[in-house]
Swiss-Prot record:
UniProt superkingdom: Bacteria
Species whose genome carries this gene: Shewanella halifaxensis (strain HAW-EB4)
Name of the molecule in the record: Aminomethyltransferase
Keywords for the protein's UniProt record, in alphabetical order: Aminotransferase, Transferase
GO biological process: glycine decarboxylation via glycine cleavage system
Family classification: Belongs to the GcvT family.
Coiled-coil residue spans: none
Gene: gcvT
Broad EC category: transferase
MF (Gene Ontology): aminomethyltransferase activity; transaminase activity
Pfam families according to UniProt: GCV_T, GCV_T_C
Length: 364
């Protein structure tokens, strides 16, 4: 029996096409994935992300615990509400999950983890907490709605009350604030401006309806995937997992090597990987017809004339750009051209940094 979010009936009201997503009944689209994609790039769209898992980490050792648990360093967070992105690694340096951590105070943090990895994440976190004076509390009574797009903030402002609008006025990216019953954060998974709003389940339907009446278009998993891929954002399970280290997943910037004496999980293994060298994640664009898909092979010839091979981790047709884009894990010796094997033919592609569209515009 699939899990249903508190917004399940709202999806049906908007003719959502429901599919199983890691054990959750979630909307793939509400009629047109392309229209939903363009709504977020050009106007405002909203997503039910209530299947994500909110976990509060509270106690005297909360900071010390998270400095051990995460490859990024929460000690960098000094201003209440400031957030950071990073990986939770195993002892081999593999990515257990990628997550966002909000600093609320020196003894209180909030983390948001992926739905597909919830059980293993919670098991790992609870295993690691031994010896720390910390309470780890899952918050299943909270739902979450993401409103994204160039007009998302203005439209959301017509829904929030005066106190909430005052609390978020001028809030920079990657911050969150509790205001009234809502936790409103300037985060997202689309490459557009907007908010992710954590709301008590009892209030979620009314908030969704208010956003709908404010002209924010419901968007499903299909658009969420094309938007995040255009933005060059990883999807756990495709672009990285426990078999992949963050340096090979374009997450090197999220590893805080300093201070050198912070012994975060996986550090020793990752230092060895860094010294020996590892693959990297690149972006690919293809002018030819067709769509690059996950699992296809990538070939290129290195500077020594040796053929090298990599693999597509995520690929799609980009509605914004009008051609196929992909992310691929490849040997570091790759240049700016390669070939992708499609239907037993090799098709030329350009190699770029893994970021294609930001704030509605081409990013390369």
């Amino acid at each position: 029996m699939a899990n249903k979010t508190v917004l399940f009936n709202k999806h049906l009201e908007s003719n959502g096409k429901m599919v199983d997503f890691h054990g959750w009944d979630m909307p793939l689209n509400y009629g047109s994935q392309i229209e939903e994609h363009h709504a977020v790039r050009q106007d405002a769209g909203m997503f039910d992300v209530s299947h994500m898992t909110v976990v509060d980490v509270i106690g005297d050792d909360a900071c010390a615990f998270l400095r051990k648990l995460l490859a990024n360093d929460v000690a960098k967070l000094k201003v209440p509400g400031k957030a950071l992105y990073g990986g939770m690694l195993d002892h081999n340096g593999g990515v257990i999950d990628d997550l966002i951590t909000y600093y609320l105070s020196d003894t209180e943090y909030r983390i948001v983890v992926n739905s597909a990895t919830r059980e293993k994440d919670l098991a790992w976190i609870n295993e690691q907490v031994n010896g720390f004076s910390v309470e780890v509390t899952e918050r299943p009574e909270l739902a979450m709605i993401a409103v994204q797009g160039p007009n998302a903030k203005a439209k959301a402002a017509t829904v929030f009350n005066a106190e909430q609008n005052a609390a978020i006025e001028g809030m920079k990216p990657f911050f969150g604030v509790q205001t009234g019953s809502l936790f409103i954060a300037t985060t997202g998974y689309t490459g557009e401006t907007g908010y992710e709003v954590i709301v008590p389940e009892a209030d979620a339907e009314a908030l969704w309806q208010a956003f709908l009446e404010a002209g924010i278009k419901p968007c499903g998993l299909g658009a969420r995937d094309t938007l995040r891929l255009e933005a060059g954002m990883n999807l756990y399970g495709l672009d990285m997992d426990e078999s992949v280290n963050p340096l090979a997943a374009n997450m090197g910037w999220t590893v805080a090597w300093e201070p050198a004496d912070r012994d975060f999980n996986g550090r020793q293994a990752l230092e060895k990987i860094k010294a020996e060298g590892t693959d990297k994640l690149v972006g690919l664009i293809m002018d030819a017809k067709g769509v690059i898909r996950h699992g296809m092979s990538v070939f290129f010839t290195d500077s020594d004339g040796v053929e090298q091979q990599g693999i597509i981790t995520s690929g799609t047709f980009s509605p914004t750009l009008g051609y196929s884009i992909a992310m691929a894990r490849v040997p570091r010796s790759i240049g700016d051209v390669a070939e992708v094997e499609m239907r037993k033919k090799r098709v030329p592609v350009k190699v770029i940094a893994p970021s294609f569209v930001r704030n509605g515009k081409q990013a390369f």
